[in-house]
């Protein structure tokens, strides 16, 4: 299992308690690459599932809602502070939000 966690320590703790090695990436320090974001977007079913409706940057969030799909992706790539967290990847699978039931099925 090759697990990558973008975001919260709570998700990291879940895997640590089960002695599963993870790669933790703090989105405040290092943003997702275009390829990583594309992979996650395809795995979860689109950009809308990646957006955090309670994000502090309400202007960017509102703007993203009114752009074309390619513009939305580019804007999201530039402004990753509106992503819902945690984003957890395991190969081609991914989840957005705290999803221990799904992660348990990965084990």
PLM regions with names:
Residues 1-30:
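Local sequence-structure signature of Cys/Sec-based thiol-disulfide redox active-site neighborhoods
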Residues 30-107:
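Thiol/selenol-based redox catalytic cores and closely related redox-interacting motifs
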């Amino acid at each position: 299992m090759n697990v990558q966690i973008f975001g919260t320590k709570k998700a990291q703790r879940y895997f640590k308690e089960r002695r599963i090695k993870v790669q933790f990436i703090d989105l405040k320090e290092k943003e997702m690459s275009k390829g990583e974001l594309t992979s996650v977007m395809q795995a979860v079913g689109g950009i809308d599932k990646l957006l955090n409706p309670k994000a502090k940057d309400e202007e960017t969030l509102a703007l993203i809602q009114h752009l074309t799909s390619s513009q939305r992706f580019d804007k999201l790539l530039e402004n990753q502070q509106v992503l819902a967290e945690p984003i957890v990847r395991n190969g081609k699978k991914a989840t957005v939000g705290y999803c221990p039931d799904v992660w348990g099925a990965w084990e």
